[in-house]
């Protein structure tokens, strides 16, 4: 790779990092072609961008980014692939699902909404984080619940008073 190509790659990575608040870094080395293809397909279906990157280029892109990645660049050794998503738990769920069949991909670290998570031991926590949409749905459900109880009570009261009037 020439210096110019590296510079362009760093600019592209910096732009990708600037466009998201959710990045997972994992090691997918050792996966055969079929498994890697299945992983890419699953990522595509979930709206996740999966890209194998050079560690030095990713480290420089993180440096150039306006985000504070903390200790995340320290995990950049060996083979690295980044998962870029709009949903915080989607890459974690995919990695966890693939780990049922083999020991890879291994989570190196993640950056989610200004929080840095380092190590494969964080995978369970990251996979169970509720997405923004799930949280909004829960809040709406909680807000609707008291109103539904009141309406139900009023309907029962009204139905009871109609029965008494008919007798």
UniProtKB/Swiss-Prot annotation:
Segments crossing the lipid bilayer: none
List, in alphabetical order, the GO biological process terms annotated in this UniProt record. translation
The Gene Ontology CC terms held by the record are: ribonucleoprotein complex; ribosome
Q: Cross-referenced InterPro entries, in alphabetical order?
A: Ribosomal_uL10 (IPR001790), Ribosomal_uL10-like_sf (IPR043141), Ribosomal_uL10_bac (IPR022973), Ribosomal_uL10_bac_type (IPR047865)
What would be an example GO MF term here? large ribosomal subunit rRNA binding
Q: Which domain of life is it from?
A: Bacteria
Alphabetized, the UniProt keywords read:
Ribonucleoprotein, Ribosomal protein, RNA-binding, rRNA-binding
Output the NCBIfam families linked to this UniProt entry: PRK00099.1-1 (NF000955)
Q: What does this protein do?
A: Forms part of the ribosomal stalk, playing a central role in the interaction of the ribosome with GTP-bound translation factors.
Task: Give the family this protein belongs to, as stated in its UniProt record.
Answer: Belongs to the universal ribosomal protein uL10 family.
Q: How does it assemble?
A: Part of the ribosomal stalk of the 50S ribosomal subunit. The N-terminus interacts with L11 and the large rRNA to form the base of the stalk. The C-terminus forms an elongated spine to which L12 dimers bind in a sequential fashion forming a multimeric L10(L12)X complex.
Q: What name has this protein been given in UniProt? A: Large ribosomal subunit protein uL10
Q: Which gene encodes it?
A: rplJ
């Amino acid at each position: 790779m020439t210096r110019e190509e590296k510079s362009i790659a760093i600019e592209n990575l910096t732009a990708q990092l600037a466009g998201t608040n959710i990045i997972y870094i994992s090691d997918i080395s050792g996966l055969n072609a079929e498994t890697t293809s299945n992983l890419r397909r699953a990522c595509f279906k979930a709206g996740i961008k999966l890209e194998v990157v050079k560690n030095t280029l990713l480290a420089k892109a993180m440096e150039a980014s306006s985000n504070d990645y903390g200790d995340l660049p320290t995990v950049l050794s060996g083979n690295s692939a980044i998962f870029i998503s709009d949903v915080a738990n989607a890459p974690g769920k995919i990695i966890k699902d693939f780990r049922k069949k083999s020991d890879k991909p291994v989570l190196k670290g993640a950056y989610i909404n200004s929080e840095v998570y380092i190590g494969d031991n964080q995978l369970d926590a990251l996979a169970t984080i509720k997405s923004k949409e799930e949280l909004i749905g829960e809040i709406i459900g909680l807000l609707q619940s008291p109103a539904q109880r009141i309406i139900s009570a009023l309907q029962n009261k009204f139905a009871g008073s109609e029965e008494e009037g008919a007798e």
